[in-house]
């Protein structure tokens, strides 16, 4: 199907995407490049329904096997979050198609116009706390049912375990391996081994020993300035999610980086006012 467009010349909507249009007889009347992606194409689609009214969707298209893992993982992440709280665009579907002998994958979601980025501190904290407190792991364990991706890195979280230390160690080990592939630096190798063998167990094992426990919470997975915003209706929004069931404080990790607006103490203070710090608090800085 050739899109009747104003902006993207000769844009073709693959037949595999057509099945997700809301009502039979709907047609795409406009396709506009929207936002920025370092790895694929992002498009706003305007759909005309048989009634004559219009609806907007956001389409992300990526190449190759990594593109498939990314689109599927983000769709499953959005679906999981949306079932708990409607602070994400509604997930519509994902799939695959081939064009000019290139394999593509796509993610189709509700289009939501955004305003301020990041969202206001109290609003974002309330939104994130709602997700963490209301979500329930389907197995009662940490992990996720499919791989999810942080940028172009496939996260090693697609298994289930009772131990947060085990899951985080798997996750961090994969990240360290990705980093090692980019440069040769023996000191980095040694530091990575020490962090995994000494630091991670020292910080995380006490969360689940001596009678203490933590709940596996559904997390955003990449909660930084660029992946949260205020919508047109004033509500905070999440997007570009890379979810799994984790310790809730995982989502606050990005907030420690001074380059992020979320490093402002107002964000952490607002969250801690709603969700207390996990014990033993004395082991944290």
Identify the role of each PLM range.
Residues 1-31:
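Juxta-kinase regulatory segment immediately upstream of eukaryotic protein kinase catalytic domains
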Residues 33-166, 170, 178:
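ATP-binding pocket architecture of kinase catalytic cores
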Residues 25, 51-55, 235:
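Short acidic/polar mixed-charge low-complexity motifs
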Residues 87, 117-120, 263-264, 281-285:
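Membrane-helix interface segments
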Residues 12-22, 97-100, 136-220, 231-233:
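An alpha-helical support segment within catalytic cores of ATP-dependent transferases
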Residues 164-169, 173, 177, 213-218, ...:
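Active-site Asp-x-Gly
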Residues 10-14, 75, 265-268:
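Short, surface-exposed alpha-helical segments at coil->helix boundaries
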Residues 185, 189, 277-284:
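Helical subdomain adjoining the active site within ATP-dependent kinase catalytic cores
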């Amino acid at each position: 199907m050739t899109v009747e467009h104003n902006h993207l010349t000769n844009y073709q909507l693959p037949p595999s995407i057509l099945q997700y249009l809301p009502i039979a007889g709907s047609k795409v009347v406009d396709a506009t490049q929207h936002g920025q992606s370092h790895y694929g194409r992002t498009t706003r689609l305007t759909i005309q329904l048989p009634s004559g009214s219009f609806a907007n969707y956001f389409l992300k298209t990526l190449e190759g096997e990594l593109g498939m893992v990314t689109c599927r993982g983000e769709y499953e992440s959005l679906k999981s979050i949306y079932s708990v709280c409607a602070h994400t665009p509604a997930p519509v579907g994902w799939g695959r198609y081939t064009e000019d002998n290139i394999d593509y994958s796509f993610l189709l979601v509700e289009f939501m116009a955004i305003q301020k980025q990041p969202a206001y501190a109290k609003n974002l904290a309330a939104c994130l706390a709602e997700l963490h407190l209301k979500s329930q792991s389907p197995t009662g364990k940490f992990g996720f049912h499919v791989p999810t991706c942080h940028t172009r890195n496939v996260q090693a979280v697609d298994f289930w375990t009772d131990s947060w230390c085990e899951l985080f160690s798997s996750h961090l080990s994969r990240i360290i391996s990705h980093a090692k592939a980019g440069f040769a630096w023996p000191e980095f190798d040694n530091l990575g081994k020490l962090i995994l063998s000494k630091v991670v167990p020292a910080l995380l094992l006490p969360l689940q020993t001596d009678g203490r426990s933590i709940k596996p919470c559904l997390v955003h997975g990449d909660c930084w300035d660029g992946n949260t915003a205020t919508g047109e209706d004033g509500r905070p929004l999440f997007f570009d999610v890379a979810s799994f069931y984790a310790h809730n404080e995982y989502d606050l990790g990005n907030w420690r980086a001074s380059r992020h607006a979320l490093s402002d103490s107002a964000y952490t203070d607002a969250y801690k006012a709603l969700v207390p710090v996990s014990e033993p608090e004395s082991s944290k800085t």
